[in-house]
Amino acid sequence: MPEPAKSAPAPKKGSKKAVTKAQKKDGKKRKRSRKESYSVYVYKVLKQVHPDTGISSKAMGIMNSFVNDIFERIAGEASRLAHYNKRSTITSREIQTAVRLLLPGELAKHAVSEGTKAVTKYTSSK
């Protein structure tokens, strides 16, 4: 009588290594879909502001959700502004106006100045 086929040994319980590829029945390997997030950028900004402070994965999830929400609001408002002015392109001017409309007082001023600085840096590096 033939011996039953042995399956691969189960990983140790304390193993921390993440499995990057899922095993299919026919032996082919399938890559997992990549989940895009702003976590790398949130972490970089955190280290600029508070070098000795860390962030939990739950807090990072909240920050990621926050950035996505603000992005959608600004993009939506900029789209509306372009539509009102019969334009088919969203420019930095629409983004700037959208930020002024969405963010309150001093926060809008700081956001506009940082945005202008970023656009200037980008255009000068081209």
UniProtKB/Swiss-Prot annotation:
The lineage of its organism: Eukaryota, Metazoa, Chordata, Craniata, Vertebrata. The modification N6-malonyllysine is found at K117. This is Histone H2B type 1-C/E/F/G/I. The modification N6-methylated lysine is found at K117. The modification N6-butyryllysine is found at K6, K21. The modification N6-(2-hydroxyisobutyryl)lysine is found at K6, K13, K21, K24, K25, K35, K44, K47, K58, K86, K109, K117, K121. The modification N6-acetyllysine is found at K6, K12, K13, K16, K17, K21, K24, K86. Residues 1-12 have a biased composition (Low complexity). The modification N6-(beta-hydroxybutyryl)lysine is found at K6, K12, K17, K21, K35, K86, K117, K121. The modification Dimethylated arginine is found at R80. It comes from Homo sapiens.
